[in-house]
Design a protein with these regions (language model features):
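A glycine- and small-residue-enriched flexible loop/hinge signal that marks low-structured segments
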Residues: 2-396, 421-425, 431-433
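Generic hydrophobic secondary-structure signal
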Residues: 3, 377-381, 385, 405, ...
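Residue-level marker of positions within ordered structural domains that often coincide
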Residues: 212, 414, 451
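C-terminal structured domain segments
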Residues: 401, 405-447
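C-terminal edge-of-domain segments
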Residues: 432-475
Length: 475
C-alpha cells in the first residue's frame, strides 16, 4: 500500500513543481532607464563609440547602441518598438551578449582583447567554410537561373514583352540517366501530345537543353526520339572547356567521329561551344561562373523569328550579337572557329568586344539541311500546311474543292516568298485521280527554294596588267 501511495504521489509532485511561480523580474520604466544611463552611469557617448553602427560586406547596416541613447527618446522608442527594427534589435542584443560574456570573465583588458580576436578568427573561419559549402551546393541551380536570364535577355525586345516559353524542372543528367528513363519519356510525351493534336498552332518549335548531354549517344537520342518525330529543333552544348585546344581534342577523338552524320534526325540538333560569363567569382569561390551558350542563342533565335524571320540565322556579326554577354571562356580566332564549325559545332567568338554566335550548323553532314534556319523554315511551312489541311478533311473531292485548296495554299506561299520573306521560290502541285479519290486521298506536293546564308567569301584579286597576271585567292 505504501508503494502505491508513493507511485500516486509522483505525478502530483511533478504538477506542483510545474505550477511553481516563476522568478519575478524587475521591470525598468523609461524614466528609470534614462536615469541609469544618464550622468549617474557615465557618459553615454563613450559607450556608443565602443559599439557603433557599421555596414557588413554586403552593405547591410547593423545598428549600434547609439540607438538606445536616453537623450534621444523618440529614436530609442522607435527602435525598441517598431517591427521594422526587429532584425536590428536581435543583432544588437547578440552583440551586447558577446560583450557581457567577455567582460564578465576575469582578466586584463589585453586578455579580453586577445580572446575577442581569437573568437572572431574562429567565427570568420567557420563562416568561410560554411559559405563555401553554400555556394558549392547552389552553384548548379544558380547557373541554370542565369542561363534562363540570358535566354530572356536575348528573346525580349522590351523588358515586359511576353515570351512563349515553358520550363521543365529537370537537369540534363536526369534526362539522360540510363537507369531512369521516365523523366525523358514524360518530357517527350508532353511535346508529342501537342504535335499530335488536330490543331497544332500551340506545338513546340525549339527545345533547349543547356549544358552537355554526356555523350554522342545521348545527343542522338534527343534528336531521334524528341526532335525528328515532333519537328522540334534541339539546342544543346559541349562541355565547359577552358581552351580551344580542349574543344578540338574532344571533337577529334574517335568516340566523337559520329557526332555529325547523314541520319535525318541529326538535322534537328545544333550544338554550341564557348560558354558565357555569368559573373565573377566571389570571395567564397575559386572560379568564375559560366553559362551554356545554347540558352542565349535560343533567345536570339526566338527574337529573330519575329524581327527578321526564321530564314535568317542568328549568327555572324550583323545578326548573332548576344545581349548581356561580355566575356567568353576562351578566345577563338577565324581559323579556330572554322575548325570547330567543320565538326558541326557552332562556336561563340569575341568580335570587336562583343560575343557573337559564329555558326548556324546542324549535325547533318549533307547540304541544305546542315543549316538550322533552312530546316526550321521547312518545318514552319509543313506545320502551317498540315494545320490547314486538317481543317479540310472529309470535304467532297471535286474540282471546286481542289481549286479552292490550290488558291488558299498559293496565297499563303506567296505571302512568305520573295523580298524579305522566308522563301526564295516555291512550287505546289495538288493531284487526285479517280483511283486516289476512291481511296479518299489527295496528293499535295510542295517544293521549296529556301534562302541560304553566306558563310564564305572567296576574294580574288587580278592584276591590271593582263600580261603579268597575279591571282590572290583567300577563303
Amino acid at each position: 500500500m505504501a508503494d502505491e501511495e508513493k507511485r500516486e504521489m509522483k505525478p502530483q509532485e511533478a504538477e506542483a513543481m510545474a505550477a511553481a511561480p516563476k522568478e519575478a523580474v524587475e521591470k525598468v520604466s523609461d524614466e528609470e532607464f534614462a536615469s541609469i544611463m544618464g550622468d549617474a552611469f557615465a557618459d553615454f557617448s563613450k559607450l556608443a563609440n565602443l559599439l557603433p553602427s557599421f555596414k557588413t560586406a554586403d552593405g547591410d547596416l547593423v545598428r549600434g547602441v547609439e540607438w538606445l541613447d536616453p537623450k534621444k527618446d523618440f529614436q530609442r522608442k522607435d527602435f525598441l518598438s517598431k517591427p521594422d527594427f526587429a532584425k536590428q534589435r536581435k543583432l544588437l542584443v547578440h552583440r551586447l551578449k558577446i560583450w557581457m560574456d567577455f567582460l564578465s570573465r576575469s582578466g586584463s583588458l589585453d586578455d579580453i582583447r586577445k580572446n575577442l580576436n581569437e573568437e572572431a578568427a574562429k567565427l570568420e573561419t567557420n563562416l568561410e567554410k560554411n559559405m563555401r559549402k553554400v555556394h558549392k551546393a547552389s552553384r548548379e541551380m544558380e547557373t541554370t537561373y542565369r542561363a534562363v536570364d540570358k535566354f530572356f535577355a536575348n528573346a525580349q525586345q522590351e523588358p515586359d514583352e511576353k515570351v512563349n516559353a515553358y520550363f521543365a524542372n529537370i537537369s540534363a543528367e536526369e534526362l539522360t540517366n540510363p537507369n531512369d528513363k521516365e523523366k525523358f519519356e514524360n518530357l517527350t510525351k508532353a511535346i508529342a501530345e501537342l504535335y499530335r493534336e488536330w490543331s497544332i498552332k500551340e506545338c513546340f518549335a525549339m527545345c533547349v537543353v543547356p549544358g552537355y548531354l554526356g555523350s554522342v549517344e545521348n545527343i542522338d537520342t534527343f534528336g531521334r526520339q524528341l526532335g525528328f518525330p515532333n519537328k522540334v529543333h534541339i539546342l544543346t552544348d559541349l562541355p565547359n572547356f577552358e581552351k580551344f585546344e580542349e574543344v578540338m581534342d574532344m571533337l577529334e577523338d574517335p568516340s566523337y567521329a559520329n557526332l555529325m552524320g547523314i541520319d535525318n534526325y541529326k538535322q534537328y540538333v545544333s550544338v554550341f561551344a564557348n560558354y558565357l560569363m555569368a559573373r565573377n567569382a566571389n570571395q567564397y569561390e575559386d572560379e568564375d561562373m559560366w553559362t551554356p551558350p545554347s540558352a542565349a542563342v535560343a533567345g536570339k533565335m526566338y527574337q529573330g523569328d519575329t524581327i527578321v524571320g526564321m530564314q535568317q540565322p542568328m549568327a555572324g556579326f550583323k545578326y548573332g550579337k548576344i545581349s548581356d554577354a561580355k566575356y567568353l571562356r576562351f578566345k577563338a580566332n577565324q581559323p579556330d572557329a572554322s575548325k570547330i564549325n567543320e565538326k558541326g559545332v557552332n562556336p561563340l567568338v569575341s568580335f570587336e568586344g562583343t560575343a557573337v554566335a559564329m555558326g548556324a550548323a546542324t549535325l547533318f553532314s549533307k547540304e541544305t539541311f546542315n543549316v538550322y534556319s533552312i530546316r526550321r523554315t521547312y518545318d514552319y511551312v509543313y506545320k502551317t500546311m498540315r494545320n490547314y489541311l486538317n481543317k479540310q478533311t472529309f470535304t467532297v473531292i471535286d474540282q471546286k474543292f481542289i481549286d479552292a485548296m490550290r488558291k488558299d495554299i498559293d496565297k499563303f506561299m506567296k505571302a512568305i516568298t520573295g523580298g524579305d520573306n522566308i522563301l526564295q521560290d516555291y512550287n505546289v502541285v495538288i493531284f487526285a485521280d479517280d483511283e486516289m479519290r476512291r481511296r479518299q486521298e489527295i496528293d499535295v506536293k510542295v517544293s521549296l527554294n529556301p534562302k541560304y546564308p553566306a558563310r564564305t567569301f572567296n576574294i580574288e584579286f587580278v592584276a591590271w596588267n593582263q600580261d603579268n597576271q597575279t591571282n590572290v585567292k583567300d577563303k
